[in-house]
Amino acid sequence: MQVILLDKVANLGSLGDQVNVKAGYARNFLVPQGKAVPATKKNVEFFEARRAELEAKLADVLAAAEARAEKINALGSVTIASKAGDEGKLFGSIGTRDIADAVTAAGVDVAKSEVRLPNGVLRTTGEHEVDFQVHSEVFAKLTVNVVAE
């Protein structure tokens, strides 16, 4: 099925690309999420008329994401207190929600879906590097200090 992409899609293309995808992928994911429209003659003409507007909108979203990433990088570090044993092992763990709440409390709005923990949840005290994917192309890093209560 031929579709016109309205947004950048990983491993597929970027704004304005006409790509051939399986019908189920287009029907169940791309079209409902607003990432693509079927490549009919009417939609192609409509898209070409709105191309500049859509590109400007994407540029604004990217600029806003870069600004948020700069704010996250400017924070430097965030401290989270949690109950821990004598050897520095936490009772429980610190996950994406806890980190997102701590960063939001520090003054930068972050959704838990933007927090990336490549090594899984934090289970020990100390400093941990945490990645944030604010946009599909924009990443930020932050140090999370986990201290015992």
From Swiss-Prot:
Q: Which PROSITE patterns match?
A: RIBOSOMAL_L9 (PS00651)
Q: Which Gene3D superfamilies match?
A: Ribosomal protein L9, C-terminal domain (3.10.430.100), Ribosomal protein L9, N-terminal domain (3.40.5.10)
- Which superkingdom does the taxonomy of this entry point to? Bacteria
Q: Which GO terms describe its biological process?
A: translation
Q: Which UniProt keywords apply?
A: Ribonucleoprotein, Ribosomal protein, RNA-binding, rRNA-binding
Transmembrane in keyword set? no
A Pfam family (short name) is Ribosomal_L9_C
Cellular component per GO? ribonucleoprotein complex; ribosome
Q: Which family does it belong to?
A: Belongs to the bacterial ribosomal protein bL9 family.
Q: Which HAMAP family match?
A: Ribosomal_bL9
Q: What is this protein called?
A: Large ribosomal subunit protein bL9
Q: Which organism is it from?
A: Cronobacter sakazakii (strain ATCC BAA-894)
